[in-house]
Structures are given as structure tokens and as C-alpha cells.
């Protein structure tokens, strides 16, 4: 998946605040020596995966390279890459872009790593939609970037508002533990969610806060039989974590209560 929406280049990148000091020193030396050669500059991959960050680098180069006397070639955003493959090739005067090596490499490294990780999850899911909640695992200044990268990697949706804006998609989410804890009871929280959320928001209920997961799943299933879309399991490691056996147990108990009729846990109430 790709998104060609232009992203504004941060001023701190343009003025070189995010660049390493030795690049500033290099440009200073070359300037004093009267050297500004026309060069061919290539960025290669160090591993296989999904390339991401191309569009941001193109936006940066459009901003800093002269209109004439330049040539830029790059792979398409979201392309599968192999080890040592050329990702970007720039032909221009070194002084026009040499300062931005740090930003270009950092963008490609982080975004491609996130996109590749997302792609691995999507591949393992075998057709089941995967939603990125990665924004809670990074600094807020890059929350949009990690969600965008996950979307490029194949995720069907992202969780943050800025990620939704950058991918031009509707942010996706379920229920946090805080809502269930404040409401004091899982079914009560689920019914409040059902009452107050727009109809187009999937009713996916968190079921591991107070009681046994299967018990809570049955309770919310009965209370919201006509509207529930799925359940979310987030059992902490201290209680055994999320395991195939736990998923199978919940599935069988839901089937026994006629709340779950799909032939596979992947297709029905489980999330």
C-alpha cells in the first residue's frame, strides 16, 4: 500500500539541525576549498524487506535540489527490496544535498523497519485484516510516521488520528482498559460504548479486565448479541498471556452458548 500525499518538510531538517556535525564540517571544508563536484550518490539496502520513506525523501529533495542540473531515481514506496539493492540514486552537485544524508538514512531505516515488521505481521495473518497500534510504542513526534509505515507495510488501518490523516484512512480502535476500570464492569462499559459511538464504529469489546476471559466474552456476547463485532484479548504475561489454547477455549465456550457460529476463530467473534 502506498500514499502519495505530500508531507511538509520540517524546518529543522532543511536548516540541518537534524544532520550530524561532520556533514556540516565537510560542507564547510569543501566550500573553503572551492569544491562542489557533480556526483552520483546511491543509497542501498542492508537487508531485504519493504522500503518506506521514499516519498518523504523525494519531498525533501524537491525542496533542496536546484530545478536544473539534477536527476533523482527511486524505487516506489512500499516496494519489496532485497539485500544490497539500490533504493535511491541522486545525480546533482554535492553541496545541494550532502547535508541531508543523516535525514535520508534515518527516514529510510526507521520507516522501512516499521513497514517490514508490519508486512511480516500481515503475511502471518493470512488475509485477516491487521490494525497498527504501534503509535503507543514510539515517541509521539513520530506517531504518524510509524502508523504511515505500518500502512505501507500492509496494515488495513492505524490507530492514531495523525496516522489516519497521513494515510487518508479512518483511525481504528477498540476499548481501553481505563474505560472498563472507570465504568467498573465490562458489560456496562461495552453497552456504554455501544450507546455513544457512531454506528460505523465496529463494536469490539475488551474482555480481560475483571474476570475470566471466556466468562466475560460470553457476558458481553449475550448483552450485545445484535451489535457486537468482535472481542479483544490482551491477557498480561503475568496471567499466562495470549495463547492458542486460550483462544480455542474462548471459541469453544462461545460456540457452546450459540454466540459464535463461524467455522474458524479467524472469521468470527474473536479479534
Predicted ranges, named:
Residues 1-95, 103, 108-111:
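Flexible, solvent-exposed loop/hinge segments and secondary-structure transition points
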Residues 17-21, 208, 234-235, 267:
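Acidic side chains
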Residues 79-81, 88-256:
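Buried, small/hydrophobic-residue-enriched core segments of structured protein domains
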Residues 260-271:
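Single conserved hydrophobic/aromatic residue that forms the stacking wall/gate
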Amino acid at each position: 500500500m502506498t500514499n502519495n500525499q505530500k508531507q511538509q518538510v520540517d524546518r529543522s531538517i532543511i536548516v540541518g539541525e537534524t544532520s550530524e556535525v561532520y556533514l556540516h564540517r565537510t560542507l564547510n571544508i569543501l566550500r573553503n576549498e572551492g569544491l562542489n563536484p557533480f556526483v552520483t550518490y546511491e543509497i542501498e539496502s542492508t537487508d531485504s524487506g519493504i522500503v518506506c520513506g521514499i516519498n518523504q525523501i523525494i519531498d525533501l529533495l524537491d525542496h533542496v535540489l536546484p530545478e536544473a542540473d539534477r536527476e533523482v531515481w527511486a524505487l516506489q514506496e512500499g516496494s519489496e527490496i532485497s539485500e544490497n539493492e539500490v533504493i535511491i540514486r541522486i545525480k546533482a552537485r554535492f553541496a545541494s544535498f550532502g547535508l541531508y544524508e543523516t535525514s535520508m538514512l534515518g527516514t529510510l531505516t526507521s520507516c522501512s523497519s516499521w513497514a517490514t515488521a508490519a508486512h511480516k505481521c500481515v503475511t502471518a495473518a493470512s488475509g485477516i485484516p491487521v490494525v497498527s497500534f504501534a503509535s503507543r510504542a514510539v515517541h509521539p513526534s513520530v506517531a504518524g510516521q510509524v502508523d504511515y509505515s505500518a500502512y505501507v507495510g500492509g496494515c488495513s488501518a492505524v490507530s492514531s488520528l495523525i496516522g489516519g490523516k497521513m494515510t487518508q484512512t479512518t483511525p481504528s480502535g477498540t476499548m481501553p482498559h481505563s474505560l472498563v476500570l472507570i465504568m467498573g464492569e465490562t458489560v456496562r462499559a461495552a453497552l456504554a460504548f455501544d450507546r455513544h459511538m457512531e454506528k460505523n464504529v465496529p463494536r469490539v469489546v475488551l474482555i480481560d479486565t475483571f474476570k475470566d476471559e471466556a466468562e466475560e466474552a460470553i457476558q458481553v456476547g449475550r448483552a450485545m448479541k445484535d451489535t457486537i463485532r468482535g472481542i479483544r484479548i490482551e491477557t498480561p504475561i503475568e496471567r499466562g498471556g495470549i495463547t492458542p489454547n486460550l483462544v480455542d477455549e474462548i471459541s469453544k465456550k462461545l460456540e457452546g452458548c450459540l454466540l459464535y457460529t463461524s467455522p474458524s476463530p479467524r472469521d468470527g467473534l474473536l479479534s
